[in-house]
C-alpha cells in the first residue's frame, strides 16, 4: 500500500458517514537536487525554468479523460463538447480506491534558478499560462504567490471555491 493510499482510506471512511466528497493531493519530495512527486485530482505541479512553464503532472478530471477518447476517435467532438461536467474529478482522495495516481519515482533533476509551483485548480484553472509566467517571474517565492492571489481575486469569478499556491525556489 502506498503512502497516498494509506492516507486515502481514513478520508474515505470519514466521508462515507457524511456526504460524498474528497480532496485533491499534490506533494513533492526534493532530495539531492532531484524532485519526486505524487498527485491525485486536479491540482497542478509546474516547473518554471529559464522563463518557461511546464506542467509536470496529469490532472484527473473528466475533460482530460474525454479528450483522450476524442484523440483515439472513440467519441466525436460533439460528444466531447456536450459533456455537462468537464471539470468533474475522475480521481481524488476520499474514494474507496484510487482510480488514478500520477507520480514520478525517477526524480527530475533540478537546476539553480528553477521554481516549482504547487497549486489548486483555483489558480491553474483561473490564470492563463501568460499570467502564470508573469507571476512566477517575480523576485521571491512570496512575491510570486502574492501576484497569483491578486490576479485570481481580480477576476472575481462567481464559483471561485479555492485558491492555494506554494512556490519553491531552487538555489
Predicted stretch roles:
Residues 4-171:
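PP2C/PPM-type serine/threonine phosphatase catalytic domain
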Amino acid at each position: 500500500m502506498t503512502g497516498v493510499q494509506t492516507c486515502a482510506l481514513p478520508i474515505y471512511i470519514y466521508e462515507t458517514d457524511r456526504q460524498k466528497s474528497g480532496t485533491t493531493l499534490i506533494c513533492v519530495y526534493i532530495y539531492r537536487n532531484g524532485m519526486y512527486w505524487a498527485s491525485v485530482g486536479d491540482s497542478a505541479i509546474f516547473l518554471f525554468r529559464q522563463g518557461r512553464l511546464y506542467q509536470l503532472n496529469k490532472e484527473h478530471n473528466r475533460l482530460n479523460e474525454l479528450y483522450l477518447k476524442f484523440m483515439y476517435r472513440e467519441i466525436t467532438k460533439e460528444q466531447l463538447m456536450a459533456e455537462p461536467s468537464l471539470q468533474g474529478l475522475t480521481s481524488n482522495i476520499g474514494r474507496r480506491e484510487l482510480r488514478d495516481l500520477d507520480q514520478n519515482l525517477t526524480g527530475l533533476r533540478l537546476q539553480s534558478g528553477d521554481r516549482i509551483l504547487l497549486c489548486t485548480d483555483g489558480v491553474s484553472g483561473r490564470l492563463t499560462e501568460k499570467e502564470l509566467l508573469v507571476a512566477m517571474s517575480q523576485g521571491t517565492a512570496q512575491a510570486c504567490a502574492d501576484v497569483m492571489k491578486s490576479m485570481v481575486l481580480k477576476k472575481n469569478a462567481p464559483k471561485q471555491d479555492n485558491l492555494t499556491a506554494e512556490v519553491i525556489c531552487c538555489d
